Amino acid sequence: MNVIPTRTDRPDLRNFPDFLILGPQRTGTTWLFFNLHLHPEILLHRMKETYFFSTLGKPEHPHFRYPCLEDYLGSFDERFWERLKKHYICLRKSLSVYRPKIHGEATASYALLPEEVIAEIVACKPGIKGIIMLRDPVERAWSHAKKTLVRGSSEPVGFEKFREYFESTGQRQRADYPSMIAAWKRHLAPVHLYLGRYDRIVSAPSPFLEDVERFLGVTTKALFFNRHLTIKLNPTSDASMPEDIRRFLEDLLANDIDAYRRILSDIGDGRAV
């Protein structure tokens, strides 16, 4: 491999994830992570946001944790007490034994991975699946700005600060759903990329979760749903979007909004592509 660092020429890939929740940020990935976390047939990494593939070769990055692939794969190993706890919870909730069939993890920055990284991920696990969540670009951008600029700040944030944030390259990329979808589709096997709708988390959480579980190939039962089904996770402040910011975003993201609506028209309630 040229991009993903390894200690050996033939690393043990048994722990390589079977699926990745790709993001982007503020689209419901935390909700999805916690609602899949205790499914008896899924071993989901204990940590939401491992950042492994996003921080390759960047030891100075604040989220850098795993120097090489073997370290990352080793982090999927469950401690005895973790496995025992999952056995107990699964038996209590659904009379099911915790017996994971698939591994997965969720890092919302993976939606924007360079294609050379995506290609090596798929080379490691040709059958890997990905999930991209779709949210109205204006609402997603505002939610992300509240989390980044407003949360924990004692000072009011002015329009110019918001404008600078929204016009940044990273934020523009996160609104460009067609590009992130195309990049992953070019490398994943056919129908191994699921496009999910953020609004279904609110309007139809149970059917949406069932759709995701069917896509992943695990058993779907209402008994497997947990208390997080109707809980808003990782929320930002309730501050409503000022009209001047809404108008600015609607103008800035006009093409992205049109593309988003076309995608929704194509996928309906969500589907694999």
PLM segments and residue spans:
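PAPS-dependent sulfotransferase catalytic core
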Residues: 1-101, 106-107, 124, 138, ...
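Phosphate- and divalent-cation-binding pockets in alpha/beta enzyme and binding domains
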Residues: 31, 113, 120, 140, ...
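Structured helix-beta-strand junction loops
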Residues: 39, 127, 255-256
